[in-house]
Curated annotation (Swiss-Prot):
Its main location: cytoplasm. This is 2-hydroxyacid dehydrogenase homolog 2. Keywords: Cytoplasm, NAD, Nucleus, Oxidoreductase. It comes from the Eukaryota. The lineage of its organism: Eukaryota, Fungi, Dikarya, Ascomycota, Taphrinomycotina. It is an enzyme of class 1 (oxidoreductase).
Amino acid sequence: MRVVLFSSQSYDRGPFEEANKTFNHEIIYHNFSLNKDTVSLAGKAQVVCVFVNDQVDADTLKALAENGVKLVALRCGGYNNVNLKAASEYKITVVHVPSYSPFAVSEFTVGLLLSLNRKIHRAYVRVREDDFNIVGLLGCDIHGKTVGVIGTGKIGSNVAKCFKMGFGCDVLAYDINPDKKLENYGVQFVEQNEVLKKADFLCLHCPLTPSTTHIVNSDSLALMKKGVTIVNTSRGGLIDTKALVDAIDSGQVGGCAIDVYEGERNLFYKDLSNEVIKDSTFQRLVNFPNVLVTSHQAFFTTEALCSIAHTTLKSASDFYTNSLDESVIANK
């Protein structure tokens, strides 16, 4: 069958071609995003494959349905960029990759926190410029500190265990469906506000839903310890960026490391080095010396890309043989 990938990059082709040796689909790669203006370029696809910043809204889904598309496959875990209600109305099934490599994201989370705390990214730049002064690079021991984890799916659980067992931290966690197995590792489940109030380091690992949108806002920031460090490798919309900027400016937040941003659709996965970025909130954020921003790369490992490709193409095959695994369906 014909599978059309939107927002594909050079690094997607290898894993998809390798995985396709098992499934034998016809794959077409587009390096531009899917939206209502590019949807016609899906052509006669039977499966449309999209990524985190493709705009799969009602208009786009309507056009896909009119062209006979029955399956939209996300090559990522989240699906907040897809109008699931509209997809169901147009009888389009939406699948995602619920667990491609939880180690990739959890390891990156720990790396961000360590880099921010010990100013490793700034030290690297200094030494490259023959500046060997360490003034301004002071960090703190993570050992013995309290790490708060909101969201204890596979990624959040890995992060919680890493900080508890690897660094000797006190770990407080919150989840609407707590994984009680984590208690065997010494992780303590408490209410969300208690996590916010007690955490020295706060890690966000929950999906973006109406109830979690701007979970970090002016009110929740006011509850936190003065000087808290926040790490977000989940979804940008979990944080009200303007409120975060104000909290950093006032000193309420001591540092922030993010791999996602609520306005990233117009920024990430693009080379804008010769352009003026007109997002003033983002520009203000990245100019703080105690902020570390990466462009949604926490997932980006060889193992994760291979897993994503295999799961995506398997879902395409399974859909058309009526053997699709329920766990990958987003609009059940």
